From Swiss-Prot:
Gene3D superfamilies: 1.20.120.1460, Aldolase class I. The keyword NADP applies. InterPro entries: Aldolase_TIM, DUS-like_FMN-bd, DUS_fam, DusA, tRNA_hU_synthase_CS. FMN binds at residues 17-19, 69, 138, 170, 210-212, 232-233. Belongs to the Dus family. DusA subfamily. This is tRNA-dihydrouridine(20/20a) synthase. It comes from Pasteurella multocida (strain Pm70). It comes from the Bacteria. PROSITE patterns: UPF0034.
Length: 327
């Protein structure tokens, strides 16, 4: 069902933060499909921002609105990083309280922080002291045996009391041991109703739902109960879905953007990046799924995969790959 009036809540639709996937090049590509989608960075640790020589916060203003997802649990460091991010032009700071990987746990951030609501509250409070942009939290519905609805409500209430007004809830619990991050995205069952109930019990908070969402119809169903939906792998693997988002979820007067249009709009960006020494493959690897289910999609993927990594590969590789796709 197409909405009858514009909807402009910043987080009504967002693309999830995904490690190694939602790079600045990926976000720039996704922005060609949708002007309203909220895009997230990969998770960036506080240490990487404070100590690393590499600029982990580089992005183009044309990507906005973009949220920076931070990984960390030291309130002072998080506040420092949030301040830097706001100065750099990010529109939201998001704290990762959902990733269950061993590496993340060893750094004392991610899903394990659900068991430390007081610390999460301190982190949120410290960041909000330093920035005027929204500070949000992405979390799960529980961890290990701490998976009762009461536990979830207590966590949300405590973090809200510290000033957090927006939550993104992955509708699965996380197992902190015994499952890989991939398995934690698939094996724990989805419990959308629990997330709906959380929104009913905290109507004054803005809440988005995440986990297993793949179609516009599913998004519209969730939006009957939630303020926003967050989509991860489906948006990356089938980015043509993003071309319908503005019209279907924000403003019915917005045009649908086709994959070919989005790819062609990338040409100036690709040339700019090449001139700065960026390898073609670093940009176009995020574009392989652009024509999923279209005639010529396999040839598009194959040609890019076989040629974009070659020395001296330029825009002509993308143009040639595009010639295999039906107009």
């Amino acid at each position: 069902m197409i909405q009858n009036q514009p909807h402009f809540y910043r987080g009504r639709f967002s693309v999830a933060p995904m490690l190694d996937w939602t790079t600045r090049h990926c976000r720039y590509f996704h922005r060609q499909f949708s002007q309203h989608a909220l895009l997230y960075t990969e998770m960036v640790t506080t240490g990487a921002i404070i100590h690393a020589k590499y600029d982990h916060l580089e992005f183009s203003p044309a990507e906005n609105p973009v949220a920076l997802q931070l990984g960390g649990s030291d309130p002072t460091q998080l506040a420092q990083c949030a301040k830097i991010a706001q100065q750099r032009g990010y529109t939201e700071i998001n704290l990762n309280v959902g990733c269950p990987s061993d590496r993340v746990q060893n750094g004392m951030f991610g899903a394990c922080l659900m068991a430390k609501a007081d610390l999460v509250a301190d982190c949120v409070s410290a960041m909000q002291t330093e920035v005027s942009i929204p500070v949000t939290v992405k979390t799960r519905i529980g961890i290990d045996d701490l998976d009762s609805y009461e536990f979830l409500c207590e966590f949300v209430q405590k973090v809200h009391e510290a000033g957090c007004q927006e939550f993104i809830i992955h509708a699965r619990k996380a197992w902190l041991s015994g499952l890989s991050p991939k398995e934690n995205r698939e094996i724990p069952p989805l419990d959308y109703e629990r997330v709906y109930q959380l929104k009913r019990d905290f109507p004054h908070l803005l809440m988005s739902i995440n986990g297993g969402i793949k179609t516009l119809e599913e998004m519209q169903q969730h939006l009957q109960y939630m303020d926003g939906v967050m989509v991860g792998r489906e948006a990356y693997q089938n980015p043509s879905l993003l071309g319908y988002i503005d019209q279907a979820l924000f403003d019915p007067t917005c045009p649908v953007v086709t994959p070919r249009e989005a790819v062609e709009k990338m040409f100036p960006y690709i040339e700019q990046q090449l001139s700065q020494g960026v390898y073609l493959n670093h940009v176009v690897r995020h574009m392989l799924g652009a024509f999923q289910s279209c005639k010529g999609a396999r040839q598009w993927r194959r040609y890019l995969s076989e040629n974009a990594h070659k020395a001296g590969a330029g825009l002509e590789v993308v143009e040639k790959a595009l010639s295999f796709v039906a107009s």
